[in-house]
């Protein structure tokens, strides 16, 4: 973070939706993207971090919404949050899955303003096939990743801490690229830590 500054995430407002890279807003400024399985609590995490109940909307059909959603901060398009499509393996036809992978990989590889990836995982079911695919893509681009282990309130504190340590051990080889924290939208646990990570990415890189 530069000079102790902080962004006001409560000012987040919807900007636009894009089906693919070509329809995204101009590649200027700085972005932080959120990715996660359809049932990992990604929308709840975004809404909690911005203190808005319905900024990010949850699809009733997991994996069907294929749009990339952009949000601006403080009516300034310099800083953006990006909600990447949720991924529901079981209910997605192969053709849709391939298209999703193509659009997402294009965004991750070619979007110059992408400064970091917030990867949302259910603390009870971390490091799924999807999560590992995302980490692999991030590793290839040397993209920093901050993992939110969501729904931490579903576990007792000791079990949640054990899950956190287990994920950190599994990702020890990537410790320079990946950081991990517990998060609960219901209890607002981990909000300050997650915001500080986004501030560091957005404010440092947008100078």
From Swiss-Prot:
Could you give a single Gene Ontology term from the biological process aspect? Answer: division septum assembly
Cofactors (names)? Mg(2+)
Q: Where is the EngB-type G domain?
A: 28-204
Carries keyword ATP-binding? no
Task: Provide a GO CC annotation, any one.
Answer: cytosol
Keywords tagged on the record: Cell cycle, Cell division, GTP-binding, Magnesium, Metal-binding, Nucleotide-binding, Septation
- Residue sites binding GTP per the record: 36-43, 63-67, 83-86, 150-153, 182-185
Q: Does the keyword Protease apply?
A: no
Which residues of the sequence carry a binding annotation for Mg(2+)? 43, 65
Q: Which GO terms describe its molecular function?
A: GTP binding; metal ion binding
| NCBIfam families on file | GTPase_YsxC
**Family membership noted in the UniProt record:** Belongs to the TRAFAC class TrmE-Era-EngA-EngB-Septin-like GTPase superfamily. EngB GTPase family.
Indicate what this protein is called per its UniProt record. Answer: Probable GTP-binding protein EngB
Q: Source species, please?
A: Chromohalobacter salexigens (strain ATCC BAA-138 / DSM 3043 / CIP 106854 / NCIMB 13768 / 1H11)
Quote the gene name from the UniProt entry.
Answer: engB
